[in-house]
Amino acid sequence: MKKPKIFLALDTNKISEAKRIIAYGKSSKLDIGYKFGLEFFYAKGSREFISKVKGKKIFLDLKLNDIPATCSAAIRSLKDIKNINYITLHANAGEETIKAVVKSAKKTNSKIRLLLVTVLTSISNSSIKKIGHTKSIKELVKKQALLAKACGCHGIVCAGTDLKSVKKIFKGEIVTPAIRLKGDSAGDQKRVIGPKEAFKNGSTALVMGRSITKGNIKKNISRLIKELK
């Protein structure tokens, strides 16, 4: 049986905190990798630090969202970080950009797997209408999943609340953020889900930040393992 795949979100701009999370974020019962987002990537020394992380899957969550030439060039500029396994780009960038990034990634580093970010987990149905969308989040995410498939992305990033409908039409990797352990606050997230339910509904990997990295990491990982049983 495969170990549950968990990406710990290193949501910090301090290398010392990243080291703490990596040092304590271990378990023989989980397949743990590390997600580096914009906050860490913009910090001094981040590229060198990321390039030296060994033995774990590296997920670079940049959510690229620009014109084709710019996003393609951004991928090429990452060629010195050879241990990257996943990079995200945003569905809002559009078909031309997505296809250009897929092409650029193949040339730059063939082991990079591209994940298309669908509707952010901090967005609700009411807030999505304010930015001009007339469809429900579920319908929009389904269209974005089909776009990912058509453009050659390896997977998508999708809220747990949309998993059931997406799983029927998308067979690639589905990474789910906004995961909360029982009793934990949702914080700024609007569409959260528990880890066991996420895997049950079709997620292939989870991104977990605050529920694991805040406080006693070892104890929080034990809580996660218990919930997954």
Where are these regions (language model features)?
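Hydrophobic faces of well-ordered beta-strands that scaffold small-molecule active sites
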Residues: 5-10, 32-36, 58-62, 85-89, ...
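Catalytic domains of carbohydrate-active enzymes, especially glycoside hydrolases
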Residues: 24-36, 148-152
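Conserved anion-binding
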Residues: 2-4, 70-155, 159-164, 171, ...
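Charged helix-capping and loop-helix junction motifs
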Residues: 47, 72-73, 138-142, 188-196
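Active-site-adjacent beta->alpha loops and helix N-cap segments on the catalytic face
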Residues: 15-20, 40-54, 66-73, 91-113, ...
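N-terminal glycine-rich anion-binding loop in soluble enzyme alpha/beta folds
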Residues: 1-27
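Glycine-rich phosphate-binding active-site loops on the catalytic face of alpha/beta enzymes
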Residues: 84-94, 181, 191-221
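Structural motif
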Residues: 28-29, 81-82, 151, 201-202
